[in-house]
Amino acid sequence: MIQISNQDFEAAFRYFEEAVASHKRSLGPFQDFRTGLAEEWESYKVWLHHEARGRLKAGDWKPGWAGSGKILDHVLAAIRIKEDKERRNNIVEWEPKRGDKSTSIVRLLEARKQPSLRQEAENLLFRLFREAGDPEPVFNELTEAFGRRYDLISYLFFLRDWHQFMPVRSSIFPNAFEKLGVPHQMSMRCGWENYQGFLERLHEVRRHLERVVPDRIRLIDAHSFCW
């Protein structure tokens, strides 16, 4: 069982409070995650989740769509979001800055073009978003189909259920967990067990935040605290 000591959490929380209070755009001391600078910094993730779910429209999907390309079209629309500088998907590396092959969605794009890949990909995505089975096998099959792209796979699970799953940026969270005294290496380690270790640490951060922040704490608030 993952446990963050009160001492390590309080040191990290003081650092967070100081970062909020001393920032040039600060409106004052940290109060909660729904007001002030903390809300300004991280509210885009709440917006992104709602916007992406609206584009995904998984509730409208039909089993017969698998292989048609419709499911992949909805999934790609839920990833490639860029309304403006602030309202965009900066969680998944989807923009082809060095060509499509450099992105995390390259295999989604390939599946969209190739019927032999499209059927399998859309069956998997249908299972992820429309069936309430054990998520572990689906996670493992998604990594086989789309590559061990932590940003992509975790983002899809985030869209499935943000009360249970959160997106990963493997270059950021290990530093936060190290400071909290619960090291967790994530780079090049996209897998179900590693992802569960990430989520366990977020739940432990959430438990500590509930002690010191008066407002209701969501899992996404723990994610923002670590980000």
Protein language model features and the residues they cover:
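Contiguous, well-ordered alpha-helical segments that form the cores/surfaces of helical PPI scaffolds
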Residues: 153-161
